[in-house]
């Protein structure tokens, strides 16, 4: 099977403006442009984050990549969106505006799981909130149009990427149009998009309009209804469900065999030899590939999915099935009288291209305009290194696969070690501690399908669910070798691993677990079983507790061998689609049995394009073929049940006693109320001595109303009861790398230890 070819991103002839050289920081003001000798910018990037010149921040990576192509790039960071004035700060760009909300979806960044405004923003100086608008991509793009009518506007980033088709929006509780429609942009780039970005910039420099570029992978654009690239293209209609497939006509049972044969040979001269040609398998596959390359799938229109949950779920399933760059087809969705057209996903970057992108001349510091301001996101990642992209886990509550792809893109050892040396030599305040070597996951570095042909033809949503695919290479030796070489660098004293660990993969390599536990865990290691019960786990596409138990046994064994007292910190998610009240009760019993107490909890948050969000909105399961009679999914939407599910995770807290007590009685599980070992809660609220005396004397209790459950802003963190109060030695929590949204998670908070395994 032929691999789709892509032009290397470092092979283009540089634009003429490369003569200006490399800027110490990309300019944010006219004065900075004057210092560089620029009369104008070729491309201006507008972002909802402050500008930090580091590859973990999307605008810095994009800006430096375009600069390496020879373009003059300016940045407008966190502009005042109430008028177009701030968007004129750098003048009119010669080519186009590039618009992004920042490293996170602006709605997730600004609101909690209960739709309450957040009090801080990790991507803003001094964590000041309200520096970006709701749905920032749409607002910024419209202001760019207002500032300079007729200028080309390109949108991208995680917010645009996950809103590229009609999508359910949790914050307005309705299905919204593609962000292309609402933003009035010319073109949308989805995924990390370096390939598309570089090609578009060079074509724009030659005079081509953004709105005319309709043949670039990883893009979306608006076209008249029924538009086709050429006459060879064919449309596959997948806009409805429950329609029978092809039905062949029945043979006439009264027709004689000779008559059937004569009818089948009409027009054939029996006196002439007939050539029978048998196509080889390769020829048949080549023909099929050619047909797929010229096929577009029509998914249900916006107007249909906005009012029909089954069609919404069907559209979501179709999009996710068409996500492998090796076999994905184009998609089209009608919005009114126009179509939103999606080209197939981009070809993943090679190791050489990854090295090129991460080896660009980043200043690795915030822009000087911010002075000594405290920027939490920067403090969190300034001593960390991104070693890979992508995730083949397929967790339904997470959108990494939809954004970065399922194919792992890894950097070379040389590139990673060089960046560690750059941190050591150039980053102020470095004390020898690397806070993380990772990415979307900690341990998928250089893992891939054993057979490239199988990888290109695969249409599975996950390589590890329900079981690890037999074709998946799970060899962790490359990662072990990388860890050892990184530790050996002069000046490096400690390397922690804070990215999420796939423990179901790790147990395939006990040597890796030993290396991790003995050298890279600082007291606590965070992993995420997410749940203990099969019902919700099957909807999450997460492994069962057997893998957790095996990993726990190896973790504890190697910790003892190293003479270290270390703890696993399991994370769980409340109110995920497919979770019943009994499931949460059983999870609480598991926590009590294993002596865990959660000190912070978080409920599921539906984020655009996640499969779990589709379940939450439609009550259907898009992991299976959809029909009007397909299975319904139990969805926790009302406030009482969401509060109850959160309370089960903190069964030990006095504030949650009443709601759990009432629920257990209603569920017929009053046997779990008492002082015996198997009971979940005591018969009286913890700490209420008067109620305990009344209960002992046989007097009725004053049950009253329970206090409102608290809603902390960070992810769930379970502490072993024996370790409560123990101080972890690990680095700070999760990394805010570009594009890591997870439904059911608050955004990563500096110092908040929110990063964990998937």
Curated annotation (Swiss-Prot):
Lineage top rank: taxon: Bacteria
Amino acid composition bias (Gly residues), ranges on this chain: 727-737
Region (Disordered) location: 698-758
Residues that coordinate or bind [4Fe-4S] cluster: 391, 395, 398
Keywords, ordered alphabetically: 4Fe-4S, Iron, Iron-sulfur, Metal-binding, S-adenosyl-L-methionine
InterPro entries reported in the protein's UniProt record: Elp3/MiaA/NifB-like_rSAM, Methylthiotransferase_CS, rSAM, rSAM_horseshoe, UPF0313, UPF0313_C, UPF0313_N
Cofactor(s) this protein cannot do without: [4Fe-4S] cluster
GO molecular function: 4 iron, 4 sulfur cluster binding; catalytic activity; iron ion binding
Domain Radical SAM core residue range list: 377-642
Gene3D superfamilies on file: tm_1862 like domain
CC cofactor note: Binds 1 [4Fe-4S] cluster. The cluster is coordinated with 3 cysteines and an exchangeable S-adenosyl-L-methionine.
SUPFAM superfamilies named among the record's database cross-references: Radical SAM enzymes
HAMAP family to which the protein is assigned, alphabetical: UPF0313
Family membership noted in the UniProt record: Belongs to the UPF0313 family.
NCBIfam families: SAM_YgiQ
Protein name, UniProt field: UPF0313 protein CV_1738
């Amino acid at each position: 099977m032929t691999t789709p070819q892509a032009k290397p991103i470092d092979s283009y002839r540089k634009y003429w403006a490369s003569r200006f050289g490399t800027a110490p920081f990309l300019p944010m003001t006219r004065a900075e442009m004057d210092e560089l000798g620029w009369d104008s910018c070729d491309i201006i990037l507008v972002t909802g984050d402050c500008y930090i010149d580091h590859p973990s921040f999307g605008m810095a990576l994009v800006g430096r990549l375009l600069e390496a192509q020879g373009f003059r790039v300016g940045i407008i960071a966190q502009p005042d969106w109430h008028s177009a004035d701030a968007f004129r700060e750098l003048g009119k760009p010669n080519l186009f505006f590039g618009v992004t909300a920042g490293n996170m979806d602006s709605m997730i960044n600004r609101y909690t799981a209960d739709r309450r405004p957040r009090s801080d923003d990790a991507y803003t100086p001094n964590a000041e909130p309200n520096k970006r608008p709701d749905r920032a991509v749409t607002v910024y793009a419209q202001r760019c149009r207002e500032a300079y009518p007729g200028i080309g506007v390109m949108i991208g980033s995680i917010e645009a990427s996950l809103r590229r088709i009609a999508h359910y929006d949790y914050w307005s509780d309705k299905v919204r149009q593609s962000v292309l429609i609402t933003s009035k942009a010319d073109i949308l780039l989805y995924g990390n998009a370096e390939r598309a970005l570089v090609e578009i910039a060079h074509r724009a420099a030659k005079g081509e309009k953004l709105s005319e570029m309709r043949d670039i992978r990883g893009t979306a654009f608006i076209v008249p209804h029924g538009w086709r690239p050429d006459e060879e293209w064919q449309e596959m209609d997948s806009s409805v469900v429950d329609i029978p497939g092809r039905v062949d006509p029945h043979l006439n049972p009264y027709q004689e065999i000779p008559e059937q044969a004569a009818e089948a040979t009409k027009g054939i001269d029996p006196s002439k030899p007939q050539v029978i040609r048998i196509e080889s398998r390769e020829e048949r596959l080549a023909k099929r590939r050619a047909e797929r390359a010229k096929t577009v799938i029509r998914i249900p229109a916006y107007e249909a999915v906005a009012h029909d949950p089954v069609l919404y779920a069907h559209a979501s399933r179709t999009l996710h099935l068409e996500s492998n760059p090796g076999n994905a087809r184009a998609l089209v969705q009608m919005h009114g009288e126009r179509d939103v057209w999606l080209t197939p996903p981009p070809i993943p970057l090679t190791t050489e291209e990854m090295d090129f992108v991460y080896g660009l001349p980043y200043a690795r510091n915030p822009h000087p305009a911010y002075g000594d301001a405290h920027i939490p996101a920067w403090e969190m990642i300034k001593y960390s290194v991104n070693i890979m992209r992508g995730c083949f886990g397929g967790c339904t509550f997470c959108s990494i696969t939809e954004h970065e792809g399922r194919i792992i893109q890894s950097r070379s050892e040389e590139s990673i070690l060089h960046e560690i040396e750059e941190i050591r030599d150039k980053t102020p305040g470095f004390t020898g501690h690397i806070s993380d070597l990772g990415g979307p996951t900690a341990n998928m570095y250089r893992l891939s399908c054993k057979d490239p042909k199988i990888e290109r033809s695969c249409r599975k949503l996950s390589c590890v669910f329900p079981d690890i695919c037999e074709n998946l290479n799970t060899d962790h030796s490359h990662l072990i070798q990388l860890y050892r070489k990184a530790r050996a660098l002069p000046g490096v004293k400690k390397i922690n691993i804070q990215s999420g660990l796939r423990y179901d993969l790790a147990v395939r390599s006990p040597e890796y677990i030993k290396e991790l536990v003995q050298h890279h865990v600082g007291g606590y290691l965070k992993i995420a079983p997410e749940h203990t019960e099969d019902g919700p786990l099957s909807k999450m596409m997460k492994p069962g507790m057997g893998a957790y138990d095996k990993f726990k046994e190896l973790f504890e064994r190697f910790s003892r061998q190293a003479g270290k007292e270390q703890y696993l910190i399991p994370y769980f998610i409340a109110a995920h689609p497919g979770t019943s009240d009994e499931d949460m009760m059983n999870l609480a019993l598991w926590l009590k049995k294993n002596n865990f107490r959660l000190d912070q909890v978080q409920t599921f948050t539906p984020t655009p394009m996640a499969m779990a969000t589709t379940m939450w909105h439609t009550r259907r399961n898009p992991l299976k073929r959809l029909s009007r009679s397909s299975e319904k999914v139990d969805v926790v939407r009302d406030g009482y049940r969401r509060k109850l599910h959160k309370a089960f995770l903190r069964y030990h807290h006095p504030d949650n006693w009443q709601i759990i007590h009432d629920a257990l009685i209603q569920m017929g599980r009053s046997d779990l109320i008492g002082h015996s070992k198997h009971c979940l809660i005591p018969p009286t609220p913890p700490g209420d001595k008067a109620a305990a005396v009344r209960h002992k004397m046989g007097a009725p209790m004053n049950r009253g109303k329970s206090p409102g459950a608290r809603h902390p802003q960070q992810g769930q963190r379970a502490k072993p009861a024996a370790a409560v109060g123990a101080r972890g030695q690990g680095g700070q929590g999760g990394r805010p790398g570009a594009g890591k949204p997870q439904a059911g998670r608050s955004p990563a908070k500096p110092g908040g230890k929110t990063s964990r395994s998937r």
